[in-house]
From Swiss-Prot:
Cofactor binding comment, as recorded: Binds 3 Mg(2+) or Mn(2+) ions per subunit.
Tissue: Highly expressed in glandular trichomes.
Keyword terms: Lyase, Magnesium, Metal-binding
Domain comment in the entry: The Asp-Asp-Xaa-Xaa-Asp/Glu (DDXXD/E) motif is important for the catalytic activity, presumably through binding to Mg(2+).
Organism (species): Cannabis sativa
Protein name, entry field: (E)-nerolidol synthase TPS18VF
Gene: TPS18VF
One GO BP: diterpenoid biosynthetic process
Catalyzed reaction equations: (2E,6E)-farnesyl diphosphate + H2O = (6E)-nerolidol + diphosphate; (2E)-geranyl diphosphate + H2O = (S)-linalool + diphosphate
Length: 554
């Protein structure tokens, strides 16, 4: 809902150059004059000395001002993996506690909302907890709500809106900030369209795709070229981002070729003609979750596991009798080849291919670590099949479970548990031990929250995959039967649950359990970020937004 703006046109302030923006322009000018950075014909980077010039700019930046704005620009452009060491040093130089105490005792004037909200967001993103109470300074004490004078500060409102998406449970002030900033940004659109089309587009894009819940992999390309952003450092780093985009694009094409050949060689597409045959779509999950180019082998391996989630889902959803599904689930629970003898050949082929994939992943870890995750991986797949079987039995008996029961099972049948356990193993970080793997295997909240987001988004439109026919349950159906509400009531409840799940996921990523290495946390977030794109069907049951992104990336 848009609010009317009471201030006059003259007093309405869009983005305007600040001292920090002027500073960024000076740095860009000096950098361009001294650098010969360019793209070679083969798309590779020029010598290391040119890349080092970017690193040098980061190292010399004031960590409390320029440094944070540079980090924001680098993250938006999707090249933060290049500067992990420099970014970590800037972030670690910050003190969340000191930041809060200094701000709390500043009684003389409001600090710039843009800077405060940016710092809040970046520190939280990197695991430094900053209390949301810092935003109390921007509230009208007499009215108990945000100061309406802030509605003229478009730059600050954008930063506040971005920061609000790192909310955790109980932070009502960030819920208020999200509503306040969104309302006034929406209200600004008409005026912005009159005299600043670029900024109007930027505001609209931010409202639709806040940074914390978006994938820079899909949005970075929109920043290429002359882009009058509130962050002038985007112009500084975009040349490097273009080079990286071309390099990584070639890498992704090579990985898709490997995945496609593997999929063809195992023969499941021929054996299971009823199942989905979409290796490129399955690869997108891996590409989104594991963004660092160095993780090429892991992306290919992860796509293999994801392909089986889709195929086995189709076996349970569309093809087999209930008796066959029970036998298949028993086979996956025991991992005894004798258990598949009474199954159709197609299901036998699927079981063997799944077992080979799991053994391959386990053997790689065994060679490196001297112990095997085989038991944990097998147990995870057994849990998935058991959840699929529960849904198959519900359908066969025409039983509609209560909404809570459906969602608890749906968290497992979403496949997120399988994906994240495989990611945890494939990353092979120093934190990977049998003890930490057991912890991840037992569905910690970082997994259940991510899985809830996927399950609810999947059910939101009750849409089928564009090439899928068959039967599935739906949270909407369960909610309406149990509580007698309308479709709109059910969907409103689902959106509230998605919001709650995001708050739980934020908490896990901000407070950081030592068992979870940063790449695993990032993969969990990225999985949740991709979900809306994967389930945003049009009236033709297609995914136009996802297809558009795939074309631009590949």
């Amino acid at each position: 809902m848009a609010l009317s703006i009471m201030s006059s046109y003259a007093s309405f302030r869009p983005f305007k150059p600040s001292s920090s923006l002027s500073s960024s322009q000076n740095i860009i000018r000096n950098f361009d004059e001294n650098s010969k950075y360019h793209i070679r014909s083969n798309g590779d980077l020029t010598p290391q000395k040119d890349l080092d010039k970017y690193r040098d700019v980061l190292r010399k930046a004031d960590p409390f001002d320029e440094g944070l704005k540079m980090i924001d620009a680098i993250q938006r452009l999707g090249i933060d993996y290049i500067f992990e060491e420099e970014i970590d040093k800037i972030i670690q130089s910050q003190s969340a506690y000191k930041f809060f105490r200094e701000f709390e005792h500043d009684h003389h004037h409001h600090q710039d909302l843009y800077d405060v909200a940016l710092r809040f967001r970046l520190l939280r993103q990197h695991g430094l907890f900053v209390p949301a109470d810092i935003f109390n300074k921007y509230k009208d004490n007499n009215k108990g709500c945000f100061d309406t004078r802030l509605r003229e500060d478009i730059k600050g409102l954008l930063s506040l809106y971005e920061a609000s998406h790192l909310c955790i449970e109980g932070e009502n002030i960030l819920d208020e900030a999200a509503l306040f900033s969104a309302q006034h940004l929406e209200a600004s659109m008409t005026r912005l369209h009159r005299y600043d089309q670029y900024q109007a587009k930027f505001v609209a894009t931010t409202l639709q795709n806040p940074t914390h819940k978006s994938l820079s992999k899909f949005t970075a390309k929109d920043l290429f070229g002359v882009y009058p952003s509130e962050n002038g450092y985007i112009n500084l780093f975009q040349q490097l981002a273009k080079v990286e985009f071309n390099r990584v694009q070639s890498l992704h094409r090579m990985e898709i070729d490997k995945v496609t050949r593997w999929w063809r060689d195992i023969g499941l597409a021929k054996e299971l003609t009823f199942a989905r045959d979409q290796p490129v779509k399955w690869y997108i999950w891996s590409m989104a979750c594991l963004t660092d180019p160095i993780l090429s082998k892991q992306r290919v391996a992860l796509t293999k596991s994801i392909s089986f989630i889709y195929v086995i889902d189709d076996i349970f959803d569309m093809y087999s009798s209930l008796d066959e599904l029970i036998l298949f689930t028993q086979a996956v629970s025991s991992w005894e080849y004798s258990a598949i003898q009474k199954l159709p050949d197609s299901m036998k082929t699927c079981f063997r291919a799944l077992d080979n994939m799991i053994n391959e992943s386990s053997h790689t870890i065994y060679q490196k670590r001297g112990w095997s995750p085989l038991h944990s991986l097998r147990k995870t797949w057994a849990s998935l099949c058991e959840a699929f079987l529960v849904e198959a039995k519900w359908f066969a008996s025409r039983h509609v479970p209560k909404a809570k029961e459906y969602l608890e099972n749906g968290v497992v049948s979403s496949g997120v548990h399988v994906v994240l356990v495989h990611i945890f193993v494939l990353l092979d970080e120093t934190s990977l031990t049998q003890k930490t793997l057991d912890f991840v295997e037992n569905m910690p909240s970082i997994i259940t929250s991510t899985a809830s987001i996927l399950r609810l988004w999947d059910d939101f439109g009750s849409a089928k995959d564009e090439n899928q026919e068959g039967h599935d349950g739906s949270y909407v159906e369960c909610y309406m039967k149990e509580l007698g509400g309308s479709v709109e009531d059910a969907r409103e409840e689902m959106m509230e649950k998605i919001s709650d799940a995001w708050k739980c996921l934020n908490k896990e990523c901000i407070l950081r359990n030592p068992a979870f290495p940063p790449p695993f946390l990032k993969a969990s977030l990225n999985l949740a970020r991709l979900v809306p794109l994967m389930y945003n069907y049009d009236h033709n049951q297609r995914l136009p937004h996802l297809e558009e992104h795939i074309k631009s990336l590949l």
